Amino acid sequence: MKLSELPDDHPQKPAYLGRRLPPEERYDAVVIGAGIGGLVVGILLAKAGLKVLIAEQHYVAGGYCSTFRRKGYVFDSATHFYPLLGNEETITGRLLKDLGIPTRWVKMDPVDQFHFPDGSRFTVSADFDTYVARLKAEFPEEAGALDGFFNEVRRVYYLGLLHYFRWRESEHLEPYRAQTLRQALDRHFRNPKLKLLLAADVPHWGSPPERTSFVFDSMLRLSYFLGNYYPVGGSQVFADDLARRFEALGGHLCLRALGRKILTENGRAYGVEIETGLPLRRVRRTVLAEKIISNGDLLRTYDEMLDPGETDPDAVAEVRRLRPSMPCFLAHIGMRDISGEMLDDISGYHWDSWDSDAVGQSALRFKIFSPTRFEPRMAPEGGQVLIIQRVREMDYDNVVDWPSHKAALEADALTRLAALIPDLDRRIVVMSSASAQTSYRYTLNLKGAMLGWEMSPDQLGSGRPEVTGPVDNLYFVGHWTRPGGGITPVIVSAMRVAELITASPAAIGSGRARGRAAAEGVPP
């Protein structure tokens, strides 16, 4: 079959996205960056009737939600699980349906798996009651504490949804706002293994439990049981579906288009200088617009794109004091002659220490994920894709030899993986790895940060940069702004900005729908 004859959701089908036409001189809105936040805000604005340009510096759309191909294998560049998006009863799932996004989703069950230093493991069911029953069977002496903990998690989930996703103040959130996951676990439990189990997926935050918000962790914890999904065809299919919808609404998506400067005058943004074209034929163009939305790295926006005279030095200093989330080392492996059952056995987080606060050092060996267990077409017939992920607490600026740094991490990962998979070398068909610098090179995220600013209590809410910029007509979407990092918060930031620009709540549904979303599907 020819590539052009493949269905749109096939992971091997090329993405014919991005007009080859250069940007026009004027738009109603220009979005800098085609990550998920940039794509969603572009769709919402185009749907509202605005003339919109999305300028993306990479040659594909999606940011961290993209894929690449090697020898017939398709690999997710970074993001590989998508809570809520396949559930039409949730805020983001309903939005995708309302926008006509055709992506199909595979529900992941089990949600996750944890391997402990004592050789035992725990599998997280997608059913909340089953999950809690297994916890109580494993830790009967903590049964009462588990009930108390999850009662609190439900309450915090609801309050956090109202505050961080609906911008509604509540005095009932105050006792929890400054609390870390570590503090909550220590308050409820004594058993160190149970504490690790309940923090065992903390690497997805890119921060240790002692610096991770209990509120945000509670929101993600319960979202798993409303549905954790993988896109049919892989991450790029989801990004491409968004991009195609944007173009169908009349939007102009321009790839290989780097935002160089945001033009400002008298405290307002009025345009963007964009560099377009192939590497040896780059051209800088000025594009005028009523509204500018940055989906890029916030410090780069301040340092490289805005005139220092147009920003408050104290505000910029506050941004500089924020801590980015940890970067992640990734190894993408195309394999043959390995059974799905073996991959199921070894998938999940592998912990070598009971100290989850050392997650970015030596406590976490790695996480193993196999997308072909959900979407077999990511590999040639008979093949499997395996992704190794390891968060790293590191001094990015002092790495002097990135190739050697990456090679050392890759060798260590393979040595440890060989202890789990016999004859590993024989089974590997192709391998590609990515360091923090790789993540930076393709996405321009500060130091390769996984999720923008760290989701610590002091960096959420008023402690996180708001979606409105330091000058009029400038807005931010994505994980460097409110409400935070992760696929749902990123989409919520886009919904918020679209609402502000169009001066209409229609961008996120009717008031009645918003009320339902505030209490959507909290597990009983």
Please state what every model-predicted region is.
Residues 191-205, 367, 423-483:
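A glycine-rich dinucleotide-binding beta-alpha-beta segment and adjacent secondary-structure elements
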Residues 117-212:
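Rossmann-like flavin
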Residues 13-152, 455:
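N-terminal glycine-rich phosphate/pyrophosphate-binding loop and immediately adjacent elements
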Residues 1-29, 47-48, 456, 468, ...:
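Extreme N-terminal leader/targeting segments of oxidoreductases
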Residues 89, 169-183, 223-245, 254-256, ...:
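Short beta-strand to alpha-helix junction loop
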